């Protein structure tokens, strides 16, 4: 409940926006007559998927959104790559053969999120080197900007000094001519 003319703003919980986007996408795709019942069924299905696969799309989406605000959240392993949640390719192939067609599509979609880690230490080292290079570049750019400002201030000071000398000399010559 909001208070009229109040400056308070409530924060939307992480992952809630992603859940609503997913629900909205499915509503637009299916065009159901009874939207609340469809939403209830959608969320029940989502809970079942989460319990079966130990993969929470809301948590994953929150981390993806958080990437833009806090890149340190992605230094650790994402939830879909942790040891307890890896899906073996053999199990997926067996499940595809034994499951009905609709479930196979759902499983294929879920598998698309799982990737095998490939030489992550090398990538981390490259990322650290890139960050160091970027920091060095930013420091150099900052020093260059500071040097430009110092030069501009000095040139301005020098120009004002010359202008004052010229003005004083023209004033002296004008005074001599008037006398």
Swiss-Prot record:
The keyword Transferase does not apply. SMART domains: IQ, RIIa. The keyword Nucleotidyltransferase does not apply. This is Sperm surface protein Sp17. Keywords: Membrane. Homodimer. May interact with ROPN1. Sperm surface zona pellucida binding protein. Helps to bind spermatozoa to the zona pellucida with high affinity. Might function in binding zona pellucida and carbohydrates. It comes from Monodelphis domestica (Gray short-tailed opossum). The gene is SPA17.
């Amino acid at each position: 409940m909001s208070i009229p003319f109040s400056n308070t703003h409530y924060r939307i919980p992480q992952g809630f926006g992603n859940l609503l986007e997913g629900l909205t996408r499915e509503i637009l795709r299916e065009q159901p007559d009874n939207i609340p019942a469809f939403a209830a069924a959608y969320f029940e299905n989502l809970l079942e998927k989460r319990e079966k696969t130990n993969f929470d799309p809301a948590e994953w989406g929150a981390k993806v959104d958080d990437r833009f605000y806090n890149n340190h959240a992605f230094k650790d392993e994402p939830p879909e790559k942790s040891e307890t949640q890896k899906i073996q390719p053999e199990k997926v192939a067996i499940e595809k053969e034994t499951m009905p067609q609709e479930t196979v599509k759902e499983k294929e979609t879920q598998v698309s999120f799982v990737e095998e880690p490939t030489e992550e230490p090398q990538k981390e080292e490259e990322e650290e080197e890139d960050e160091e290079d970027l920091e060095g570049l930013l420091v150099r750019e900052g020093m260059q900007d500071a040097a430009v400002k110092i030069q501009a201030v000095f040139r301005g000071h020098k120009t004002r000094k010359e202008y004052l000398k010229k003005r004083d000399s023209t004033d002296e010559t004008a005074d001599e001519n008037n006398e």
